[in-house]
Design a protein with these regions (language model features):
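DnaQ-like (DEDDh/DEDDy) 3′-5′ exonuclease domain used for proofreading
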Residues: 1-66, 73-88, 95
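Conserved Class I SAM-dependent methyltransferase catalytic core
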Residues: 86-108
Length: 108
């Protein structure tokens, strides 16, 4: 007997499209070091905006991405509140995971 159903996570706001203003990445030469011909980048900033900025030039080409997403620990920190409703947190993570998948190369 074949089962054709599939499991899907659903939450409030999952399908709400958000428009984020496009940005470009600017190099800060004072923070660069090492081999100037290196293909590696370290980007300091909001990871969602940075991932979107990478899309135009690097879609499907990146081998490894490390981001520091909101973890939803339930704690409040000095610079941000990490205590979101789960539906809001899932929407935040969903946006980032979709961009990550689009940026990563096949061999990643």
């Amino acid at each position: 007997m074949k089962k054709t159903g599939r499991l899907e996570l659903t939450w409030v706001g999952k399908y709400d499209d958000k428009v984020i203003e496009p940005r470009i990445l600017l190099e800060d030469a004072s923070k660069s070091y090492g081999d100037p011909s290196s293909e590696n980048m370290l980007i300091h900033g909001d990871n969602l905006i940075a991932l979107q900025a990478l899309q135009q030039d690097f879609s499907g080409e990146i081998k490894c991405i490390y981001i520091d997403p909101p973890y939803n620990t339930g704690s409040t920190f000095e610079h941000y509140d990490d205590n979101l409703e789960h539906s809001i947190w899932l929407s935040l993570m969903g946006e980032r995971l979709i961009l990550l998948r689009e940026l990563l190369s096949e061999e990643s």
